[in-house]
């Protein structure tokens, strides 16, 4: 049995999500785009979660501990494209105090299973800063392959950061590559 489970985030989760984001703000700021102060409000998260309920281009999951149901992270499939692409972008984080326990790797495996199963996608891709060694390991352990380096890909803390690009296809996933 897994130590974590995924559940689509609901409006009722907004308070726990905001508390986690505020607690981990300094930790997350080194890896994520700079957020305006308005991002860190309960109203903003309630509204965003409500809007996402019917959005088929976005799948937003909480990472919860199986024992106690504590929200310990978030994992998302965004920009879900249909038609000839059948692709999504993967993003995730685990609360700093829960890092290093394998939760991110397990969450990635679970969400990719859903992407290729329930959602019927063909490809999932992710981008990660090379210096984020823990996240690189998560993707590699979960079966993603490195595709290249995108120079000055995303602005993080005011600086344009390079990102390694990773992906996995449904065929690779099913073959256990």
Regions found by a protein language model. Name each.
Residues 92-94, 100-114, 133-141:
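Conserved acetyl-CoA-binding loop-helix of GNAT-fold acetyltransferases
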Residues 119, 141-142:
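Structural motif
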Residues 127, 145-163:
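Conserved catalytic-core motifs of GNAT/GCN5-like acyltransferases
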Residues 118-127:
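Conserved GNAT acetyl-CoA-binding A-motif
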Residues 1-97, 160-177:
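GNAT-family acyltransferases
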Residues 36, 131, 154:
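Positions that flank functional sites
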Residues 11, 15-19, 105-117:
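Amphipathic alpha-helical segments that line or abut small-molecule/effector binding pockets
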């Amino acid at each position: 049995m897994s130590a974590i489970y995924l559940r689509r985030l609901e409006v009722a989760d907004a308070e726990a999500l905001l508390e986690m984001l505020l607690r981990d703000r300094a930790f997350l700021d080194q890896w994520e785009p700079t957020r305006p102060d308005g991002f860190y409000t309960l109203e903003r998260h309630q509204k965003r979660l409500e809007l996402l309920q019917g959005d088929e281009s976005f799948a937003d999951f909480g990472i919860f501990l199986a024992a106690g149901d504590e929200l310990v992270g978030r994992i998302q499939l965004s920009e879900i494209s249909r038609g000839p692409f059948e692709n999504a972008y993967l993003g995730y984080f685990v609360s700093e105090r829960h890092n290093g326990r394998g939760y991110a790797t397990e969450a990635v495996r679970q969400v990719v299973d859903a992407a290729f199963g329930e959602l019927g996608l063909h490809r999932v891709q992710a981008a990660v800063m090379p210096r984020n060694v823990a996240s690189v390991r998560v993707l590699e352990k979960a079966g993603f392959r490195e595709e290249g380096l995108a120079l000055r890909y995303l602005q993080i803390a005011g600086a344009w950061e390079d990102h390694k690009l990773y992906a996995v296809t449904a065929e690779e996933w099913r073959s256990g590559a």
